[in-house]
Amino acid sequence: MMKSIQPIIELMGELRNFTLFWCGQSLSEIGTRLTGFGLSIWVYQNTHTVTQLSLMIFFTTLPGVLITPFVGALVDRQQRKSIVMMSDIAAALITLTLAALLITNNLQLWHTYISAFLTSVCGSFQMIAKSAALPMMVPKEQIGRANGLMNFSTAVGQLCAPILAGILIVIVQLQGLLLIDFSTYVIGVFTLLFIQIPQPESDKRRSTGVFGIIDDIIFGWERISSRIYLLILLGFMTIYFFVYGLTDVLINPLILSFASIKTYGSIMSLAGCGMVCGSIFMSIWGGSQKSILPLFIFSALNGVGLVIAGIKPSIPIISVGVLISFFTLPVILSTNNTIWQTSVEPQVQGRVISLLNTVTGLGVAIGNLSASPLADGILEPMLNSDGLLADTVGRIIETGQGRGIGFLLVIEGLLIFSISLSLYYYFRQLGEEILVTGSEIVVLEKINTIEE
């Protein structure tokens, strides 16, 4: 056991800056998730409508996605440590304001929308600045492990925040959760005071003003489009996140179509454990330093997990599928991040990563919006006992409530599996691992040769 976690211990021991940064920001992230969970409970308890809750979630996600390209351009212009610190401080002040409004009995529903919007903006700055700062703090050969640790924090937050929030909101109420979140921000900012985040060389072609920022965004896109393997990867990850957006909406009604709420909670706890284990695995393994191929291996496994989860209305079968899918998720995300962070010059990473996040974020949003029309409007009626597919597909995956959703998960899984397998063999034909080549010309020449 000690031998297996030795790489993580060595990484954290050698890289003091990254360790302090990771600890402070991880604590801050958990605090943010506590507040998000607590506010969602407050909104629902005070409105008793899903619509108002959906609006709050909308203001939490979409604004951040839409402004991300501009955030990336600004991140490349400023000190990344300062951006993380200022966004932490801004988010802390938003949380403190909410706590003050709640304590004085002045908190209104529209306050939560505004706070969700502003927190989303702060989160965009934090996410892009942290992604761009990580390669500056960690040697190239350790970036995979560092990304694994960052995803470990996310997984722990997703697993523990609902449980902790459910306990704490009874003891200290929502205002207590908000003050705990504020404290985690303070700790996060405090740790930043003791670390150094190296700044890359400035971009000599930088212009000023609004048009300068737009020009920076265009330049970031040119850095992506000039490398065919990055364009292919961007397209693949957009499809993957579209499927993720579908699954995120469908997993709840799929399980509840034949199981209890308690069973649903148990399966999702298993999913959280899978994410934690996947993050630990990635932190120990560190990923392949010279190959894009492991990304497609684990995404193919992710597709297999989705097929298993959708194939039968069985708790053990769905549990296995969910476990496989969520175990591979942090490995896929960490590997994807590592590819981008090692393939793009440090001084343009803010712009490039922000464009990646914008496109994939839109993929998630489209997946969220498409889930209901595809499942309820098309596939669920087809897999009723007298539906169009009852005597064909229904013989395999069964018919009735939730089977249209299950069939959609099977389709998603087969889609991801087939694309992953195709790209695996496509890149394998190159005859050379291309992740950290340091030369786009070599990669492009090899791809062009194959296509001819």
Predicted regions span which residues?
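C-terminal transmembrane bundle of multi-pass solute transporters/carriers
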Residues: 54-56, 66-70, 77, 83, ...
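Pair of pore-lining "gating" transmembrane helices in MFS-fold secondary transporters
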Residues: 9-41, 117, 222-246, 323
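Transmembrane alpha-helical cores of Major Facilitator Superfamily
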Residues: 26, 58-62, 89, 148-152, ...
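Helix-loop junctions on the cytosolic side of multi-pass membrane transporters
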Residues: 105, 132, 136-137, 178-209, ...
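Juxtamembrane intracellular "pre-TM" segments in multi-pass secondary transporters
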Residues: 2-18, 198-235, 443-447, 451-452
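Helix-loop-helix hairpin linking two adjacent transmembrane segments in secondary transporters
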Residues: 104-107, 154-192
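Cytoplasmic helix-loop-helix junction between adjacent transmembrane helices
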Residues: 115-158, 162
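Glycine/proline-centered helix-kink
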Residues: 37, 155-166, 279, 364-372
